[in-house]
Amino acid sequence: MAWENQTFNSDFILLGIFNHSPPHTFLFFLVLGIFLVAFMGNSVMVLLIYLDTQLHTPMYFLLSQLSLMDLMLICTTVPKMAFNYLSGSKSISMAGCVTQIFFYISLSGSECFLLAVMAYDRYIAICHPLRYTNLMNPKICGLMATFSWILGSTDGIIDAVATFSFSFCGSREIAHFFCEFPSLLILSCNDTSIFEEVIFICCIVMLVFPVAIIIASYARVILAVIHMGSGEGRCKAFTTCSSHLMVVGMYYGAALFMYIRPTSDHSPTQDKMVSVFYTILTPMLNPLIYSLRNKEVTRAFMKILGKGKSESELPHKLYVLLFAKFFFLISIFFYDVKILALIMYIA
């Protein structure tokens, strides 16, 4: 019972990845800059697709969902890391830790399934173009995206509930910059071997099964492209699919390396570096990859800048919504700082 009380009443200590030496301070602000670029890039991508009616297609709807997931993913981990670094505090409550685990696992899992849906969408568009409007109509596309969110959230709920069931009787220092599930397994007093097997199976479902769909889809796409008689058609198909393949390679490469290995093989330093790439760099690169290689997205962005034919109200809507998102981010970022200042004032 004492252990259970400790589980709910004590905070965890996030050791983080930066100290206050000049090199680490520079790296911290570099990561913070990457976070802001990722936040703005994914916000712009979501808003462009929402506001520009020419982008209201299944492919761009799925892309907007990917950007939304990336946006939520970086907001799950980086603001708390930044607050702890700037305030000098390293603690996080049990509820906060479970919340991070739930959103991190849910969003990561949802992205896995969504990337598989996006690969299937490209397969239908290239291999069955005449049936595309029937096989990928808005209703079917919406259902696939919804199931991606649901399946990812299911895994997040499993991990969050499991965290509450663990007892933590020893050290509460998490060798990471956020609450990640493998790091908590190491701290638990319970025998976690059975649960590690369950997590491994969940990872197989979340990672390997979507990868199989992606490989099967693009194998058919490659065969279809090879048999295309038009060089222009091949170039267009390659351009359409290459952006998605680059994102898949970055995302699944880091995820497979991170979660398929046994817990005993995890190195704290190695895990931190992979997590930085997985949670911050990839969300920053995704909108850049899709926008730089996509004429429709580039056209929509140029329309916003007023360098093309545009609807007069479009820029105004974008700026208002983007400002609202940025204000929301700042509110989240400084929420804990205000509480800290109030406590210090009272003391």
UniProtKB/Swiss-Prot annotation:
It comes from the Eukaryota. The chain crosses the membrane at residues 26-49, 58-79, 101-120, 140-158, 196-219, 237-259, 273-292. GO terms for biological process: detection of chemical stimulus involved in sensory perception of smell. GO terms for molecular function: G protein-coupled receptor activity; olfactory receptor activity. It is found in: Cell membrane. Keywords: Cell membrane, Disulfide bond, G-protein coupled receptor, Glycoprotein, Membrane, Olfaction, Receptor, Sensory transduction, Transducer, Transmembrane, Transmembrane helix. It is a multi-pass membrane protein. Residues 1-25, 80-100, 159-195, 260-272 are extracellular. Residues 50-57, 121-139, 220-236, 293-347 are cytoplasmic. Glycans are attached at residues 5, 190. InterPro entries: GPCR_Rhodpsn, GPCR_Rhodpsn_7TM, Olfact_rcpt. Its main location: membrane. GO terms for cellular component: plasma membrane. Disulfide bonds join 97-189. It holds the Pfam family 7tm_4. Belongs to the G-protein coupled receptor 1 family. Odorant receptor. This is Olfactory receptor 2M2. It comes from Homo sapiens (Human). The gene is OR2M2.
